[in-house]
């Protein structure tokens, strides 16, 4: 499949002048493999800095996770900062912590600078299902404040019921610097911004080989790019044919999303009066928000190994109705799946495949914001300052136990254990 999946996002995407397919031999400073957020953010930062940039996308801009996700701007990393402190030491934690709110700031700056129409709304809620989770949110607030986020507000059970019309929650952490967007329209807007800055973007141009030479040569079925530098940014949709070493360090995982029919203004505002996005604190979490046209977009669950379930509605609708029983009987207009890339450490993987070939992948569910940080860091590196990129590149990249064969059942067993703990509140 090369066209966008039949999602709400594809149905409501902004129109854009299509990008050509590469059918010739060209040269550039930097060739970026992948037209999702990692590739787009990298290319835009570099184009703004004066680099001659080429982006090669196998399908359409935002085809993968960047055009299918929940659209939530979630700060920080998938691994909490206190765990980072214990795992990697305070010096590394201070460096990583100093960057963990930059991704959202970059997105907001991009939206403003390029007038990207992507339905941005501020504010994100992390909701607690029990007292243990609420205590963890209190700790998270303290930890984030130590690293500079002063836009946090802890809500008790009464306060969260004023923000979300559900009786499931014992409290919440409101991050005023969070928010939500139409993710595919953000990707389209960023691709147009690359073009505006002189970059070249190609769709339907799947990379078949990266030749590790100086300069590097990136080949597609109908053309090739000779580049001083290459950035591999395919993430969960890269596959294992191009740079197979990357596939050994990560695992694609699927998540499922549905979108309701349009709700009345009164009903929509009764559910989430201030139009925040919401995610719970379970290991296998639910996440949801309202769209610009008053639909409820609801996602949840993980399929390890990225197998598409037979019936997305059967999996997700019960979750939606458990949260909002008042929506019983609501029609579901869209349902889809999408893959994200999981790492064993839950930290992003940055690094070098050769002296002039770089990669960034594995945001483990925090890709919307973290990809935009990644683009800034690779641009810094290619401009001569590798310090912040190397703060990530120096982290260990562990393979999943069991290798390619057993990593799925082993990880699923671990997830089942933590999900049971969530249900028991321990």
From Swiss-Prot:
It holds the Pfam family DAO. It comes from the Bacteria. GO terms for cellular component: cytoplasm. One of its GO terms (molecular function) is oxidoreductase activity. GO terms for biological process: putrescine catabolic process. It is an enzyme of class 1 (oxidoreductase). Involved in the breakdown of putrescine via the oxidation of L-glutamylputrescine. This is Gamma-glutamylputrescine oxidoreductase. It comes from Escherichia coli (strain K12). The lineage of its organism: Bacteria, Pseudomonadati, Pseudomonadota, Gammaproteobacteria, Enterobacterales.
């Amino acid at each position: 499949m090369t066209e966008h999946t039949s999602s709400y996002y594809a149905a409501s995407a902004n129109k854009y002048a299509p990008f050509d397919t590469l059918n010739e031999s060209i040269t550039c400073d930097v060739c970026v493999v992948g037209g999702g957020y990692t590739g787009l953010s990298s290319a835009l930062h570099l184009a703004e800095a004066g680099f001659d940039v080429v982006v090669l996308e196998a399908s359409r801009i935002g085809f993968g996770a960047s055009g299918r996700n929940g659209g939530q701007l979630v700060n920080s990393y998938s691994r909490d900062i206190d765990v980072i402190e214990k795992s990697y030491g305070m010096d590394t934690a201070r460096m990583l912590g100093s960057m963990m709110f930059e991704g959202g700031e970059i997105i907001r700056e991009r939206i403003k600078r390029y007038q990207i129409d992507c339905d941005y709304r501020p504010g994100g809620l992390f909701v607690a299902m029990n007292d243990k989770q609420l205590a963890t949110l209190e700790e998270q607030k303290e930890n984030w404040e130590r690293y500079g986020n002063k836009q946090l507000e802890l809500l008790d059970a009464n306060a969260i019921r004023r923000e979300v019309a559900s009786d499931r929650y014992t409290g919440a952490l409101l991050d005023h610097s969070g928010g939500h967007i139409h993710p595919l329209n953000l990707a389209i807007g960023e691709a147009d911004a690359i073009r505006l800055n002189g970059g070249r973007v190609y769709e339907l141009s799947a990379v078949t080989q990266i030749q590790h030479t100086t300069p590097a040569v990136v080949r597609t079925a109908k053309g090739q790019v000779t580049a001083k530098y290459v950035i591999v940014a395919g993430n969960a949709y890269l596959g294992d044919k191009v740079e197979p070493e990357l596939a050994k360090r990560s695992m694609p995982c699927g998540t499922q999303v549905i979108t309701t029919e349009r709700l009345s203004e009164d009903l929509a505002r009764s559910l989430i009066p201030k139009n925040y996005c919401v995610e719970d604190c379970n290991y296998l979490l639910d996440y949801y928000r309202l769209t610009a046209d008053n639909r409820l977009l609801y996602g949840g669950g993980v399929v390890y190994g990225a197998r598409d379930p037979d019936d997305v509605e059967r999996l997700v609708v019960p979750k939606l109705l458990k949260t909002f029983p008042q929506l019983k009987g609501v029609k579901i207009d869209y349902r889809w799946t999408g893959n994200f890339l999981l790492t064993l450490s839950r930290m992003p993987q940055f690094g070098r495949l050769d002296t002039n070939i770089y990669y960034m992948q594995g945001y483990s569910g925090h890709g919307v914001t973290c990809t935009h940080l990644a683009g800034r860091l690779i641009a810094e590196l290619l401009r001569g300052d590798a310090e912040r990129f190397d703060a990530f590149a120096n982290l260990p990249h562990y393979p999943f136990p069991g290798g390619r064969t057993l990593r799925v059942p082993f990880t699923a067993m671990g997830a089942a254990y933590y999900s049971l703990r969530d249900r028991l509140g321990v």
